[in-house]
Amino acid sequence: MTDKKPTIEPGWNFDNSYTTLPKSFFSRLNPPPVRSPKLAILNERLAKSLGLNVEALQSEEVIAMLAGNKTPEGAMPLAQAYAGHQFGHFTMLGDGRALLLGEQITPTGERFDIQLKGSGRTPYSRGGDGRAALGPMLREYIISEAMHGLGIPTTRSLAVVTTGESVYRESELPGAILTRVAASHIRVGTFQFAARFCSIEDLRALADYTLQRHFPEIETEENRYLLLLKGVIQRQAALIAKWQLVGFIHGVMNTDNMAISGETIDYGPCAFMDTYDPATVFSSIDVQGRYAYGNQPYIAVWNLSRFAESLLPLLHENEAQAVKIAEDVLAEFSKLYHSNWLTGMRAKLGLFNEEEQDEALIEGLLNMMKEHRADYTNTFRALTLNQPEETVLFGTSEFTEWHEQWKARLTRQPEDTDAVQQGMKKNNPAVIPRNHRVEEALEAAWKEGDYTVMERLLTVLSDPYAYTPEQVEYTTLPAESARPYQTFCGT
């Protein structure tokens, strides 16, 4: 007896261009089936933008596809090979619990990877069970969608499906599979793998494929590999600046977690900073603070140096010349990052033009925030709403002096008060996914099966710059008993 097809086609439109790469870059396999897949949450807006039918995605057959029990028409599931530096140590990696179904071509002609995360063991599993727990998959769903709402390039979450099976970590937990959507899953670690374990022809094939996929405007240029390095550096400089501007801490900036596309990828022990402190670390495994908030720009350039090393054979046949070329380009990161960050900080303070003293004004505020343990997001929110009395800085002599300097600075530009406030609202989120709110939503969802708390949180986070009355309750700080907050590498 054949399975009944859904009455409405789901809208899959798969291409599998990654399979045109040399076979060393992937392993083809179908995921092992799970016992009893059920849809936990579906991102309807994202589904529609991908050209998928929301009703069909909720059918038993398509849920089975999102669980790996069936292969969608046109998909060619594969696990990607890559390597990477994890906390500074090089190791062979690969998709240990994820499978790329293929690339969905949208009605507008865009191409997005569709990946199942938590789909079972692969040749790269390195002793792991290949599965994922429901809590961490829902957490990635929340944080990635919050990042999208903030306007930060990111992978997206299409759905989470429960498996009806348990996974065993410190305790027995419900299993789940996340459907992740990405511009691609090509990582710095993919290039490290090619440079270390493959031929120069394979490395060139990967670089050419990456150019075609992410930098088509330069794929025919004579110095295209140099331009590829420059392009990736530019995108990462812009991305890391955006992270810093909203207080996002990735937590595990290994080279395999840096996407060539310039999207934020792999939401493991990430979190948003409450109290401003450049030394903030949330990850339980980052005991040295390697990936602390203030270190993120430095780690980015370290990772990009590993990318540049991988490209050396393509930059020049003479190794010394290739190294010189790479070093010259890498030296641009600091300037690019700083320019992006300074532009963003000016916007957060309502500054439409540039003055030389702006950086001192910005640093003055940040130093006060650190000294008085002020909340990063809420301080900028209070300034945006012209409610300085709402900050813990209010009443201190240094803040009074700073506030006067800032007000005087605002008068030296043509924009009126209204324009300044509107500009600040576009750059200072009223809400972020605060750690205690995320935990509250996850507890209700995976422990009690109540997704209403999570859905409310997602609605608020989908438009963080709206400054609506509904958002106010989500601006409250965690109780002292909830600090210090720690995150774990559950994803």
UniProtKB/Swiss-Prot annotation:
As cofactor, the record names: Mg(2+); Mn(2+)
What GO molecular-function term can you cite, just one?
AMPylase activity
Reaction(s) catalysed by this chain, per the record, are: L-seryl-[protein] + ATP = 3-O-(5'-adenylyl)-L-seryl-[protein] + diphosphate; L-threonyl-[protein] + ATP = 3-O-(5'-adenylyl)-L-threonyl-[protein] + diphosphate; L-tyrosyl-[protein] + ATP = O-(5'-adenylyl)-L-tyrosyl-[protein] + diphosphate; L-histidyl-[protein] + UTP = N(tele)-(5'-uridylyl)-L-histidyl-[protein] + diphosphate
Positions contributing to Mg(2+) binding: 257, 266
- Is the keyword Nucleotidyltransferase assigned to this protein? yes
The residues listed in the UniProt record as binding ATP, with positions renumbered to this chain, are 94, 96-97, 117, 129-130, 180, 187, 266
Q: Which family does it belong to?
A: Belongs to the SELO family.
The name under which this protein is listed is: Protein nucleotidyltransferase YdiU
Q: Which gene encodes it?
A: ydiU
